[in-house]
Amino acid sequence: MDNKIVYVVSDSVGETADLVVRAAMGQFPFAPDIRRVPYVEDTGTLKEVISIAKSNQALICFTLVKPDMRQYLVTEAAREGVEAYDIIGPLIDQIEEITGQVPRYEPGVVRRLDEEYFKKIEAIEFAVKYDDGRDARGILKADIVLIGVSRTSKTPLSQYLAHNKRLKVANVPLVPEVDPPEELYQVAKEKCFGLKITPDKLNHIRKERLKSLGLSDGATYANINRIQEEIDHFEEVISKINCQVIDVSNKAIEETANIIVNAVQNQKMF
């Protein structure tokens, strides 16, 4: 049975069927000749594959999610005396029977899920790499640029947008003593969002932060005059960029994220 031909037929890429066939064939001391037939959308293609399989005395293994296509292949293969094995159909039917839910019958769902997963990972890695202004080059590469003084939730918001919306987010901290990176004035203003906060709220947040670190809440970092100076600098920079400003004083991360997502969707940026 050396070089037994196996046709892997799928209405998508065929990776699932290919992996299952290789795993099964690995239990036998012969090397199969696996030939993938992807993106099958019509019975004409199935009929052709059956004919070729018959002439080569080959086996057909398939993952077709649509019931009519599955039934056609099984019926026609049996009529021609060709062995055909349905890899995914019986499991779909069993799950439907157990759960009472109707399948979507959409080809390529696994591949789309994989692509979404990798987009998420890429976005998360981007958020880490370009967090807190570490590398200004990320500003021009980002989908979203967050701008704000310290403790305005730039980092957790960046991570939330990466995890849940698969957006690549860079964030830039503003302090009066350091000039903003030039890239901040080069990026499209529609991608930029200034995170505004009231002095009193920021004063409270910073004092709590210092306490959690075991430091005195009387440090300059939490001084109300210093905070006002930082906010004035923030407003000056934002006025030059002319981007949207979101008051995060009393907003949860999720709420701010939704405002940003709605804004970019309305602008049809992605």
Swiss-Prot record:
The keyword Electron transport does not apply. ADP binds at residues 148-155. It catalyses: N(tele)-phospho-L-histidyl/L-threonyl-[pyruvate, phosphate dikinase] + ADP = N(tele)-phospho-L-histidyl/O-phospho-L-threonyl-[pyruvate, phosphate dikinase] + AMP + H(+); N(tele)-phospho-L-histidyl/O-phospho-L-threonyl-[pyruvate, phosphate dikinase] + phosphate + H(+) = N(tele)-phospho-L-histidyl/L-threonyl-[pyruvate, phosphate dikinase] + diphosphate. Keywords: Kinase, Nucleotide-binding, Serine/threonine-protein kinase, Transferase. One of its GO terms (molecular function) is protein serine/threonine kinase activity. It is an enzyme of class 2 (transferase). The keyword Acyltransferase does not apply. It comes from the Bacteria. Its EC number is 2.7.11.32, 2.7.4.27. Bifunctional serine/threonine kinase and phosphorylase involved in the regulation of the pyruvate, phosphate dikinase (PPDK) by catalyzing its phosphorylation/dephosphorylation. Belongs to the pyruvate, phosphate/water dikinase regulatory protein family. PDRP subfamily. This is Putative pyruvate, phosphate dikinase regulatory protein. It comes from Bacillus cereus (strain G9842).
